[in-house]
Amino acid sequence: MASLQLCDGYLLFKPSVSPRFLSQRISHRLIPKASSSPPPSPSPSSSSSSLSFSRRELLYQSAAVSLSLSSIVGPARADEQLSEWERVFLPIDPGVVLLDIAFVPDEPSRGFLLGTRQTLLETKDGGSTWNPRSIPSAEEEDFNYRFNSISFKGKEGWIIGKPAILLYTADAGENWDRIPLSSQLPGDMVFIKATEDKSAEMVTDEGAIYVTSNRGYNWKAAIQETVSATLNRTVSSGISGASYYTGTFSAVNRSPDGRYVAVSSRGNFFLTWEPGQPYWQPHNRAVARRIQNMGWRADGGLWLLVRGGGLYLSKGTGITEEFEEVPVQSRGFGILDVGYRSEEEAWAAGGSGILLRTRNGGKSWNRDKAADNIAANLYAVKFVDDKKGFVLGNDGVLLRYVG
């Protein structure tokens, strides 16, 4: 499932480190990747205690030669025992925030990566390397588009962005066509999901949901009114912070069966919608702190993140207002997203390179130190399947799951 967190980013590199390099312990688990050429060979690790002194000396000399010829600067600091990710360097400006990623089901090695500053990258090797793609119809205008969401079904794909732009492909992304949109669209498009042949579902940050079945040339409303209209019409709903509501969504997530959960812009309540319902259903938050993000667990339940680093799981499955807090080691940094690799294993990511993993369905979480030296916010965790996953961050940070 895809999500969008509208959060401010931080600088990726510490002042003392050149943007071209990242200091880390050399490990087969966390390997810097270059988009245009293979990375330099890693230096040998330290020898085991069973090796003789002469063998140890030979390894040290080899390491010195290797490091002098490579572009890696300084000692490695990643924790190789916990690391399940590798850094993939991208051919983009440092200030770009990565927002979404998707792969073509009919061509599993081919995928696309979106971001701010009209960023569109393509991979044909499963995400190891990426190359820039351009959209001529978008470049003809003076706008600097923010591509928010992408989705594929078969070889058909959709991209939406801000200012309002809709792109469609029928050939796995080889060509992208610009689809005209109504200027009366309420809010900014933040999410799109390819559903069936020539069909998609689109959501705006004001809660409008539209569906199309003819490649986007006509859209039909799946909901009768925007969230603000619903809340202001039902002032006596008992939802804290909902009266005279004029805000937007700060996050929206879709379950595989088409249900939505969204967070109000101020984080003081959340909303849900199921296919067939005429309106969004508002819910009081069950925690004291404001909500940062929400989404769906692999078992059909909900996860909830609060500002400041708290993580909660709903009791049971389905939509509910009952949540239980789960202890996490976030070092005081906020957790921004959760992505499930399987029903039992999930990863959480957040500020200052925080990566957490659970192997028991969320009952306990352990910190992976792989990204500790990446001074960036990690905004989104995306698993295409149990072998292909990515973490997206600000300043062009992309981590690839290597297991």
Swiss-Prot record:
Residues 1-53, 54-78 form a transit peptide. Disruption phenotype: Seedling lethal when homozygous, has pale cotyledons but never develops true leaves. On sucrose-supplemented medium PSII is completely inactive; D1, D2 CP43 and CP47 are present in very low amounts. SUPFAM superfamilies: Oligoxyloglucan reducing end-specific cellobiohydrolase. The keyword Transit peptide applies. GO terms for biological process: photosynthesis; plastid organization; protein-containing complex assembly. It holds the Pfam family PSII_BNR. GO terms for cellular component: chloroplast; chloroplast envelope; chloroplast stroma; chloroplast stromal thylakoid; chloroplast thylakoid; chloroplast thylakoid lumen; chloroplast thylakoid membrane; photosystem II. Expression in green tissue, not roots. It comes from the Eukaryota. Signal peptide: none annotated. It is found in: Plastid, Chloroplast thylakoid lumen. Residues 31-50 are annotated as: Disordered. Keywords: Chloroplast, Photosynthesis, Photosystem II, Plastid, Thylakoid, Transit peptide. Interacts with PAM68. Belongs to the Ycf48 family. Essential for photosystem II (PSII) biogenesis; required for assembly of an early intermediate in PSII assembly that includes D2 (psbD) and cytochrome b559. Has been suggested to be required for chlorophyll a binding. A 7-bladed beta-propeller torus, about 54 by 55 Angstroms, with a depth of about 25 Angstroms and a central pore. This is Photosystem II stability/assembly factor HCF136, chloroplastic. It comes from Arabidopsis thaliana. The gene is HCF136.
